[in-house]
Amino acid sequence: MKVLSIIEPWATLIASKQKYIETLSWKTSYRGELYIHASKKHIKDKDTKIQELLKLLPSTEMNYGKIICKCQLVDCIYMDEKFINEIKQNQQEYMCGDYQIGRYAWILENTELINPKIDETGKLNIWNFEISK
C-alpha cells in the first residue's frame, strides 16, 4: 500500500475530514489509494496557528507514529495565484495548509479511518508498506 507521512495535527485533520488538501513543495504523478501516516515529529503546540487547528479536532489526542486513515489521491495541482484565491474562499481549508505560489495541492477524497491504527516508522515521499499476514 502507498503511504504518505504527515506531521500532526495535519494528519489527524485529514483523518477527521477537516482537511481535504495536503499542501507540499513537490508534485506526484501517483493517483489512487493513499494511506496517511502521522509522523512522530512533535510540533510546538503553543503556536497560535496550531491552537486554532486543534480546535477543529474532536480530541487533542495525536496519533504519532501510526497509519491512521486511507483516502484517494485524485489530483495534484500546481498552486498559482488564481488557485490560491479560490482556496481562500474556504477559510478552514486555507487555514489548514501552506498555500504559496509554486507549491502543490494534493486533492484527497473518500477519507476513511482504519481500525486498528498501524504503528509504523514513517518515511519521506510516498512509501510502500506491506501488511504482515
Predicted feature descriptions by range:
Residues 1-133:
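Structured alpha/beta reader/binder surfaces that contact nucleic acids or chromatin modification marks
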